[in-house]
């Protein structure tokens, strides 16, 4: 059975690319036609690429690998958080902090600080501290949780990155490439596909399109995990 149908892709508006003047010629092989000044993505290729990406995600998860979901644009934030959480994986859906991968030790120090404040809140320390100090600590906790909450339990570097809009997430992409971490990405007609190991040509601006494709990647991880449970049962 196929992972995704043409009907699902059409209904979610996955085929709508960017305006023809805002395009990357390297995406030409994934473009079907041009309509009213907008490029239309070849959905037959998208179906094939979703299936390839699904297999990659499933194989990584089956080997016990962690996948970091990245999407900080408004249209992606909710889907990235929901689907990564559903799959038991990590995510960045606010601002990508430079060095999240290439300077992971420093990021871990910030995560330790986040967990320390959380512990203080839970063990009653807040109750004995001056009110002013508690207010400051709560603000710090909120900020740390916002940017690092999705990776606070990530023990080491991920085995792969799943990215929505590599153009927007160029720092994350550059860091992953530097560390030879494979990247699976939703790539629109204005992006450079050469930077992505496993390209899913698709509309990265429609909430429904992003949600549909991200949920399929989460399904791949869950399929691998269910397979493990069956083996151990």
From Swiss-Prot:
Source taxon at top rank: Bacteria
Q: Which GO terms describe its cellular component?
A: cytosolic small ribosomal subunit
Give me the disulphide-bonded residues: none
Q: GO molecular function of the protein, one example?
A: structural constituent of ribosome
Per its UniProt record, what Gene3D superfamilies does this chain match? Answer: Glucose-6-phosphate isomerase like protein, domain 1 (3.40.50.10490), Helix hairpin bin (1.10.287.610)
InterPro entries the record matches: Ribosomal_uS2, Ribosomal_uS2_bac/mit/plastid, Ribosomal_uS2_CS, Ribosomal_uS2_flav_dom_sf
Q: Which keywords describe this protein according to UniProt?
A: Ribonucleoprotein, Ribosomal protein
A GO BP annotation? translation
Hey, which family's this protein in? Belongs to the universal ribosomal protein uS2 family.
Please state what the protein is called: Small ribosomal subunit protein uS2
Q: Which organism is it from?
A: Bacillus anthracis
